[in-house]
A protein has these predicted regions:
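Non-transmembrane functional regions of envelope-associated proteins
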Residues: 1-145, 182-210
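Substrate-access "cap/lid" subdomains that shape
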Residues: 131-176
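Short, mixed-charge amphipathic alpha-helical segments
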Residues: 175-183
């Protein structure tokens, strides 16, 4: 129930959008006796109404196209419409991340937006529009190429955005420290994701120094 506790606390603190960079594929209620942990999580998603979850788009030889690997159906049904974004990174041949694909279609021609783009769309309560070589969300105009890729305008090196440990946030949620959540998360975009340097999410960028 850790994710559920944090989502509820951050949402009640006034966060405008919460991005959950974690893909749960195995039902927890089949793994853990006792409480219905999937149900607890689904209730938190329904209560918050502002959570973006990730999926992954994987090549499928049978389909000869991309296949969406989505969160558990129970989670998807609890989400608001259009609140899943793909987490596939665009990685250059040297292993660095300098650009990002923002839109992808699967083999059934379903259109998906990158999680970061979905977060912006949710934050501004605006639809994503594409015209020629531009994507528009609210008043944000994003230049893209024909593959819907943008060059990333990095805000700065690691540490540019505040990071708080998952465990600390959970402890504060358990304590009911509403003041902390309002002071730190009100009207903010909040990303919940792995912080371990060995995570697959950690990739070198032009700011990287060995």
């Amino acid at each position: 129930p850790y994710f559920a506790d944090i989502i509820k606390a951050v949402s009640r603190g006034g966060a405008k959008v919460i991005a959950l960079d974690f893909l749960q594929l195995i039902p927890l209620n089949k793994k853990i006796d006792g409480e219905d942990h999937d149900g607890i999580m689904a209730e938190a998603l329904m209560e918050a109404e502002n959570v973006i979850m990730i999926n992954l788009l994987r090549w499928d030889n049978t389909l000869q196209g991309l296949r969406a690997v989505n969160p558990l159906p129970r989670y998807r049904y609890a989400l608001e419409p259009n609140t899943i974004g793909f987490a596939n990174l665009s990685i250059d041949n040297d292993g660095y991340v300098r650009r990002q694909t923002l839109l992808l279609n699967d083999a059934q021609n379903n259109n998906y937006a990158y999680i970061g783009l979905q977060v912006i769309s949710k934050y501004f309560n605006s639809v994503i529009k594409k015209e020629k070589n531009e994507l528009t969300v609210n008043d944000c105009i994003i230049p893209v190429n024909r593959y819907s890729e943008m060059m990333i305008n990095f805000a700065g090196p690691s540490g540019t955005f505040p990071i708080v440990s998952f465990y600390k946030i959970w402890q504060l949620a358990q304590q009911g420290n509403t003041e902390f959540f309002e002071n730190n998360f009100k009207n903010k975009m909040v990303l919940i994701g792995p912080g371990n340097i060995y995570s697959q999410d950690f990739k070198p960028t032009p700011y990287y120094r060995s």
